[in-house]
Amino acid sequence: MVTKMKKLFVLLTSTLLFACSSGPSLDQLAAQMPKDNRSVLLQVPEAGNPVSNGMLVATIRTAGGTSGKRLVSLLATDNLHIGIAGNSQSVNKAVAMYGLNNAEKVGKDVSLYLVGDSQSDKTDLEKAAKAKNVEMHYIMQK
């Protein structure tokens, strides 16, 4: 049990970036997530411009990248609330979809939080989450 907890601690601390806020979506996301020790934020970097972000999304869809693979690992953990935050909604969605589509094992009582402004993104993510028995919380950005 102690070994599992140590592994979980290492995984979570390597995943979390307690750095500066990435913008209003991080604040909004944190406000909507449960305030307990089962909540983690996965901060997703973006490329900096729309063309590069498009290339990054294509890469994430096929190979997952670091953030996608971290999400797959987090999804396997029981009793966890996972928030995905970053400056690009398309990159955030790509990471979430990669994680949901490629997670072979999903823990019990896992929920995913994401901020965005697209109804079609919300529908896609909810469908993928439901297939993996993950509770999806898509917060519509104002």
Where are these regions (language model features)?
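C-terminal partner/receptor-binding element of secreted or periplasmic proteins
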Residues: V115-K142
